[in-house]
Curated annotation (Swiss-Prot):
One of its GO terms (molecular function) is magnesium ion binding. It comes from the Bacteria. Mg(2+) binds at residues 5, 92. This is Ribonuclease VapC10. Its cofactor is Mg(2+).
Length: 133
């Protein structure tokens, strides 16, 4: 199963055709998942006019909880990478730990936020997108 990061969902909501096409294609291989962190990020960042579309999108994913095991793994990752990658937030560590503990493939546009996955590549290209550091 693929764990989809918030930035992929945001690209879809902003009408990026490559994001929509990738989501449609990825669903052919089975259900997709998101972290509870992505749920909070999307709800927290949505505009009032987007409410219905955001809720519909979120309902189409399996939501992975942040368990104690995931929290401990996120803490381990944070200790390892906090000096070399000091702009990675707790949310991204929790998403990374969810993927690691649940043995899920991670799909993100911000690969720099996930140095713990050395072979990670963005699932699609977004013209003009520059990952945030």
């Amino acid at each position: 199963m693929i764990l989809v990061d918030s930035d992929v969902l945001i690209a879809h909501l902003r009408g990026v055709v490559a994001a929509r096409d990738w989501l449609v294609s990825a669903r052919k291989d089975g259900p997709l998942a998101i972290s509870v962190v992505s749920t909070a990020e999307l709800i927290g960042g949505m505009r009032t006019a987007e409410r219905r579309e955001v809720w519909r999108l979120l309902a189409s994913f399996r939501v992975q909880p942040a368990t104690e095991v995931i929290a401990r793994r996120a803490g381990d990752m944070m200790r390892r990478y906090r000096r070399s990658h000091n702009r990675i937030g707790l949310g991204d560590y929790l998403i990374a730990a969810t993927a690691d503990v649940q043995d899920l493939q991670l799909a993100t546009l911000n690969v720099w936020h996930f140095p713990m996955f050395e072979q990670l590549k963005p699932p699609f290209a977004v013209p003009g997108h520059r990952p945030r550091a």
